[in-house]
Amino acid sequence: MIVDRRSFVTLLTAAASSLLYGCKSSGAAGKLGIPGLFPGRVVSVHHSGSHTGGEFQLEPIRSMMRRGIVDLTGAPDWIAAWRLFFERGDVVGIKVNPVGSPDVISCAEVLREIIAGLNEAGVTNKDVVVYDRYRRQFLRAGFQNWLPDGVRQDWAVEDYDGIQLGMEGYDPEHYMEMALTQPGQDAHDPHVRRSYVAQFLTRRVNKLINLPVLKHHQSAGVTLALKNLSHGLVNNVCRSHSSSTLNACGIFIPAVVNLPVIREKTVLHVLDGILGMYHGGPGGRNGKYLWAHHTLYFATDPVALDKTGWQVLDAKRAEKGMTPVALSRPDEDSHFLNCQPEHVEIAGALGLGVWDDKKIDRRILDLG
């Protein structure tokens, strides 16, 4: 059954604006883009059996996925929910997160359930593309081993480098420009002031699903939905956190996500919080700050989602006797002088979603 979208929600539209020194980008304008069909709505689904004995458990995760997407949309069933966002002929990208492997990455079971949902909406496997920036990180995490037959994989470049100004895999027609460079670069050179969007997004897919994880981040404070987009879809991101004291994540992250091609093509966020990392992120610390949270989060609004995830991380830190993320100071596992989770609030001010807790509609489900 295909559900009339108008029966679920009054759709919002917003014109994407340039930020700071401007941007050049365009996307296929549509009402599905950020903040999406359900601004301010965040559905969390908990199941204590989703990770047991050190392993992800398929059946509980499948139940969580089905309940979460239905409750997010208000659709009568799993198939109708997916058809609200996707249809036959769409080419859909899935932005995974391999950073922090093997501790906290987008898990195979959630990824495969997303692909199953796309299939129900009429999207064939050949029209699904799973992506991360770096080929080597993608392969080291093992994503290629998890994909159903026919699903494609993609990346922008071979591996991480500290300069990130190469254009292979990036689109010269889509970029965010701001007056921010790495030390020693010519600040008058437009190329070093720009971050270009991956061709994966600009040329190869027409819709994007964001599959972030639940983690602390030394420079950004938290790495959730917004940062998975900003630092996974463009180049020249090292300038946003060049050193422990030269940190501009607070403004860089929302500036990138505000690019029309990102904002308009990103239609759904599924935050994998089955495992979380409450300190020492983004990389692993041999499981030192790892915990089983057993929860998936569903949203079309990355700001409301990240505000929720940030509060989850702060609650876990409080349980461990640690200060909130925004007040944290450098230590042996987190070296930045001042992390910048305020990127979430700034994104809200740009119209990328709902920041105010009083306006966030949190729907909390416990399946066992």
Regions found by a protein language model. Give the residues of each.
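N-terminal secretory signal peptides
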Residues: 1-4
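Hydrophobic alpha-helical segments, especially transmembrane helices
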Residues: 6-7, 228
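N-terminal export signals
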Residues: 7-28
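Extended, low-polarity segments enriched in aliphatic/aromatic residues
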Residues: 27-88, 99-101, 105-112, 120-368
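Aromatic-residue-lined binding/catalytic grooves and analogous aromatic/hydrophobic interfacial grooves
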Residues: 115
